[in-house]
UniProtKB/Swiss-Prot annotation:
Belongs to the NAC-beta family. It is found in: Cytoplasm; Nucleus. PANTHER family: TRANSCRIPTION FACTOR BTF3 FAMILY MEMBER (PTHR10351). The keyword Cytoplasm applies. One of its GO terms (cellular component) is nascent polypeptide-associated complex. Residues 164-183 have a biased composition (Acidic residues). Residues 150-183 are annotated as: Disordered. Component of the nascent polypeptide-associated complex (NAC), a dynamic component of the ribosomal exit tunnel, protecting the emerging polypeptides from interaction with other cytoplasmic proteins to ensure appropriate nascent protein targeting. The NAC complex also promotes mitochondrial protein import by enhancing productive ribosome interactions with the outer mitochondrial membrane and blocks the inappropriate interaction of ribosomes translating non-secretory nascent polypeptides with translocation sites in the membrane of the endoplasmic reticulum. This is Nascent polypeptide-associated complex subunit beta. The gene is egd1. GO terms for biological process: protein transport. Keywords: Cytoplasm, Nucleus, Protein transport, Repressor, Transcription, Transcription regulation, Transport.
Length: 183
């Protein structure tokens, strides 16, 4: 075969050299190793396998309570016995009510700690037993509450009179027969 013909055939076919083949092989091998290292969680699962569970870290409130207890011990708090209820009055007129809380106090450091479940209630729910606990700020909100209650009673009284009139038997008019309209 002629050398010129062979050179033309090789140029048209572009036969690669051994070194370029090794370079391509190294790239493919390094990519597969990289994929195996980074995607180990995804390779072992196939169709029909359950999803990977994510580990959730729950922050326990027990640790916070322990920190609080140690801080309170440093302040030399003393438990106060025989407290039946604690009410905290908010500016909007609602009350945070603690029934039978545990109370610790440190008078020199002016610190009080309440333990228990607090429920947010309206002032109307606690009115009979809470009157002796009201201060001057709360008395103003109590007056507003009493005025609104009186207005509601007046409105209910006028509606009650209207309901009584509607329940009465209508007056009959001479010359009209209501029984014929029913049939």
């Amino acid at each position: 075969m002629d050398q010129a013909k062979l050179a033309r055939m090789q140029a048209s076919v572009r036969i690669g050299t051994f070194y370029s083949f090794l370079w391509i092989f190294e790239v493919l091998v390094s990519e597969s190793v990289f994929l195996r290292m980074t995607a180990t969680n995804f390779i072992d699962r196939g169709k029909g396998t359950p999803r990977r569970k994510v580990k959730k870290v729950h922050k326990s409130s027990g640790a916070d309570d322990k920190k609080l207890q140690t801080t309170l011990k440093k302040m030399n708090v003393q438990p106060i016995q025989a407290i039946e209820e604690v009410n905290m009055f908010k500016e909007d007129g609602n009350v945070i009510h603690f029934a039978a809380p545990k109370v610790h106090a440190s008078v020199p450091s002016n610190t009080f700690a309440l333990y228990g479940n607090g429920e947010e209630k309206e002032l109307t729910e606690l009115v009979p037993g809470i009157l002796n606990q009201l201060g001057p700020d709360s008395l103003a909100s109590l007056r507003k509450l009493a005025e609104s209650y009186q207005n509601m009673q007046k409105q209910a009284g006028t509606e009650g009179k209207k309901d009584e009139d509607e329940d009465d038997i209508p007056d009959l008019v001479e010359g009209e027969n209501f029984e014929s309209n029913v049939e």
